[in-house]
């Protein structure tokens, strides 16, 4: 079953995470975004993966996010969604 990973990461981590994922042969779409109470700049990464690839992709995101400095400020938020249908045209 296909999964959609939506990873919202700090904008300064976005390029490093994108590089790591593409080097691991994941197809990734990066979207500039902002959010949260302070409207901080973020990067939203979209990945379509097989179910058995989710853990490895999440691990790459974790490994290539900068260390958390402030307990109230997370470096990444990752959503994993079921994909009912997937097609490329």
Which residues does each PLM region occupy?
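Positively charged, small/polar-rich N-terminal and surface patches that mediate targeting and assembly
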Residues: 1-89
């Amino acid at each position: 079953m296909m999964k959609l990973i939506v990873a919202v990461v700090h904008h300064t981590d976005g390029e490093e995470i994108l590089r790591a994922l593409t080097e691991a042969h994941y197809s990734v779409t990066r979207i500039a975004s902002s959010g949260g109470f302070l409207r901080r700049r973020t990067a939203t990464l979209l990945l379509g993966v097989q179910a058995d690839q989710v853990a490895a992709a999440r691990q790459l995101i974790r490994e290539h996010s900068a260390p958390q400095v402030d307990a109230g400020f997370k470096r990444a938020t990752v959503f994993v969604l079921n994909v009912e249908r997937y097609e490329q045209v």
